[in-house]
């Protein structure tokens, strides 16, 4: 299992580094080039070619540092992909995305665009404690204590395991 850290900070800010400023990226982890865990940092760290390879996005919760670049991903992928990207999350997160982000006011509804037969995103409802097979990995959401409905993830691939708390 190959995990690439795209960002792991609560905000996008510059911090001093030994060789100059470092741009912190919000939460995003790319697993095996195809599965993204949280969507805080995508386009600011991945070339379009890399974004096209993403098949599944797992979301832990709705806080902005975990979904910030999801609309940008959708915009970048319109007309660029043959299959929609699966947005996998617990029901509260999927409902919140539709109500507050992809509502036609803040951002277009990429669950229906560019057309309902070929949307950029398709929702996939995760259930706490149930393992699903996504991108060849076992994915189990585990409820964690946070101020909004939130899950962490247990990812299993062969003999490899990653646990991600979300916050």
Residues covered by each model-derived region:
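DG-centered beta-turn motif at the end of beta-strands
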Residues: 165-167
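Binuclear metal-dependent hydrolase catalytic cores
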Residues: 1-163
